[in-house]
Amino acid sequence: MPRFILIIFILNFYNVAFSSTKNEIIYKLKQTKNLSFDFIQTINEKNENGSCIIEYPKKIYCTYNNLNQKIIVSNGKSLVIKNQNSGNRYIYPLKKTPLIILLDKKILISKITVLEPRIIDNKYLNFRIFEHNTEINIFFDKKTFDLVGWQTEDIYQNLIITFISSVKINKIIDNNIFNLPIED
């Protein structure tokens, strides 16, 4: 009987700890209107870097520091990937991309509420989220509860890992950056 009580106590302790952790992450998300950050993105072992601004709900603007000077823009409905050098432009419905989960706080919070996080390397909390026939792994710092990155697949089933740093929350931003780029 004492073993049973000890097991129940330990399980309860972990449930309370994870519940508190999830509440901290959800609280931070609810307080966040926008965030800007630098990123390193790995696709098929090739690294790219740049900077992004996310504004909730559903908007993102990213510039890549690469030869093609790629930009990614979402106005909340569509996602455009544009190569500034060549002028090539690809447009996708945002709801058909895994980014919809990251960019829609309501979806993100509702999923985190019902999921249990996995602890990765005793440093990160990971939530594996499925929505709209897409999957995304989202990572938070275990101590600060800050978003630190995500992992997903692109339309060609390439694994994409994005690590973010130098995060700034609730900055004043120019909303014109979320206007979709026009064709050249």
Please report, for each region that a protein language model flagged, where it lies by residue.
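Short, solvent-exposed coil/turn segments at beta-strand boundaries
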Residues: 31, 53-59, 74-78, 121, ...
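Solvent-exposed strand-loop boundary residues in beta-sheet-rich modules
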Residues: 43-45, 85-87, 156
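An acidic-aromatic
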Residues: 52-101, 160
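Flexible, surface-exposed loop/linker segments and immediately adjacent secondary-structure boundaries
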Residues: 85-124, 129
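Sec-dependent N-terminal signal peptides
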Residues: 4-13
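A short, Trp-centered hydrophobic/proline-enriched beta-strand micro-motif
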Residues: 27-47
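Gly/Pro-enriched, hydrophobic low-complexity segments
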Residues: 110-184
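Boundary at the C-terminal end of the N-terminal hydrophobic targeting segment
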Residues: 17-19
